[in-house]
Swiss-Prot record:
Localization (cell): Cytoplasm; Cell membrane; Mitochondrion
Protein name as catalogued: Prickle planar cell polarity protein 3
Lineage, uppermost ranks: Eukaryota, Metazoa, Chordata, Craniata, Vertebrata
CDD domains: LIM1_Prickle, LIM2_Prickle, LIM3_Prickle, PET_Prickle
The organism of origin for this protein: Homo sapiens (Human)
Keyword field: Cell membrane, Cilium biogenesis/degradation, Cytoplasm, Developmental protein, Disease variant, Leber hereditary optic neuropathy, LIM domain, Membrane, Metal-binding, Mitochondrion, Phosphoprotein, Primary mitochondrial disease, Repeat, Zinc
Region: Disordered, residue numbers: 1-26, 396-567, 587-615
Amino acid sequence: MFARGSRRRRSGRAPPEAEDPDRGQPCNSCREQCPGFLLHGWRKICQHCKCPREEHAVHAVPVDLERIMCRLISDFQRHSISDDDSGCASEEYAWVPPGLKPEQVYQFFSCLPEDKVPYVNSPGEKYRIKQLLHQLPPHDSEAQYCTALEEEEKKELRAFSQQRKRENLGRGIVRIFPVTITGAICEECGKQIGGGDIAVFASRAGLGACWHPQCFVCTTCQELLVDLIYFYHVGKVYCGRHHAECLRPRCQACDEIIFSPECTEAEGRHWHMDHFCCFECEASLGGQRYVMRQSRPHCCACYEARHAEYCDGCGEHIGLDQGQMAYEGQHWHASDRCFCCSRCGRALLGRPFLPRRGLIFCSRACSLGSEPTAPGPSRRSWSAGPVTAPLAASTASFSAVKGASETTTKGTSTELAPATGPEEPSRFLRGAPHRHSMPELGLRSVPEPPPESPGQPNLRPDDSAFGRQSTPRVSFRDPLVSEGGPRRTLSAPPAQRRRPRSPPPRAPSRRRHHHHNHHHHHNRHPSRRRHYQCDAGSGSDSESCSSSPSSSSSESSEDDGFFLGERIPLPPHLCRPMPAQDTAMETFNSPSLSLPRDSRAGMPRQARDKNCIVA
C-alpha cells in the first residue's frame, strides 16, 4: 500500500541560511524553548521547535510575499470588472481598505477586534503578517517556492494557479450602505445591515451579497480574510490555503499541493509517496507500524522514546501493545499487578477506587491507614454503594467522597455498566398520586434503613457527594498500533449497572370480597370491559393482578366501586348477610363493583341510584 518512492524530494533545494531573513527569530508559541527559527530542509517548519514560519516573530512582510500579493491583485483587476486600487499603508495603520475616507477607515476598523486592527508596531500588525503567510502560501502559486517538482507537475501548478485567479480570486470592496435602501442581510451571521452601516461587498458572490466587516471570514478556518482577499467557490468565500485544498489534496509533510498521480492517504490525510515517513527520524513508514500523534506519523521506536508514559505502579514504560489506565496525569499498566490498592494490593480493575495523594486505594479504611477488612454481611461493600459510576466511551466519571475526618477524598470506579438498562424502581407506583407510602392504597412501602451503632464508623459516603458534575475522569486506552495498518481504538464494553431489586410479595389481603354476577355488569357497561392477567410470581392476591392496558390515576378512568385500585366498602345499611359460598375471593373477570341481584332488588331506589365517594 505504501510504496517507498525516491528520496530526491526530501533532499531537494532549500534556501541557504544566509538568504532567510527570518533566521533566528523567536517562536511565539514555544518562547524560550526555541533558540530561533531555522528552516527545515524540505518541510515548511522550524528544525528546532517544529512550528511553522508564521508562528515566529516575523517583523515585516517578506519581499517575495509582497511581490506575489501584487501579482495576485494585478491579475484579479485584469480579469474583473472592478477598477478599485489596492490598499495602501498610512502613518497609523499598516494597511487600510482602498477607496475610503479617513473617517470611514476608522468606522471600518472599529468593527474589528482590537487585537486584529493593523496598527503600526502592534499585535494587529503581527496578526496580519501571520495571516498573510498562512492564508496565501507562496508555494500554492509559484513553482520556485516548492521543494522539487517534475516538469509535468510544474505545468499543472501554473495551470492550477491561473484557473484560480481567473475563476475564483476576488477582493472585497468596503463602502457605506446607502441610507435610501431599507437594508440587506449579512451572508455570514444572517443579521441585518442597515442604511448608513459600513459593509463589505464581494463581486464574485453577486451584486447583493454583503457582509459585516467582522463577518468577512474564511468558511473553513473562520479567520478574517487578510486584506479582504478571498476565493469564491460554490457559494462560499475561502482564504487561499483552504480554497486550494477544496480542489487538490495537500501534503501534510511539505505543505504543498499534490500534483503527482499517486499519493499516500492515511486517516483522512494525504502525503506524497515519499513523504509518508516518521516525523522525528524521517524513516519511511511504507508498510510499517506507526502511531499518529497530532496528525504526524511516528515510528514505534521514536514514539516510545519521546512520548510513551511511565507506569506509576512499576515505573516501567507503557508499551504501545499494552493497555493503560490514566487519571489526572497518572498512568498505570492495565493489569492487576500495577493497577491495585497501594496498601493491601487488591486489584482495582473493574472496581471503584479512591485516589489520595498520588496513590490509589480500594476503600477509605486503606486510605486512612487502618487495617483492611474483607467486605462481609455487616459491612457495606464499595461496589454496592452509589460510588459506582457508569463507564461510557472508555471513560468513567469520578465522584467525590467526603471522609469522616474532615478531609475530602475522591472516589471513582472502573466498573463497567450497560449502555441501556432498567432504571431503579421509583418509590411511587406509576399512575398513583404522589403521596406518602400507604399500604392500604396499594403503594409500596419504603423500608427504613437499619440503625447503625454509635461506635461503628459510617463508611458509606453521602449520596450528595457523588454528583455527575465531577471533572476528574479515568480513561482506559487500548494498544495504539496494530500490525499492518493504522491504529484502531477499541471501545470498552458497556458499563454494568445493578439490576433493580424486585419488591417483596405482599401478604394476602384479609378483606372479604363479595361475589357478584359479572354478566349483568357487562351488559350495562359494555365499554368498560378490560382483560386482567395475574402475575404468577407475586402471589394469588387480587392486588398482584394488573390489567393489560395502562390505567390512569384520574377518577374519570376509575371503574365504579373502585378507588386507586381498591374496592370501596359498602355502607352498613347496604350490607346484608351473604351465603357461605359468596364469601370466597371474587374473580378477576370484571374490575368494577356490582351488587347481587337479590340485594339490589330489596334496596330502595334512592339507595340504588347513589354513588359512594371517598374523599
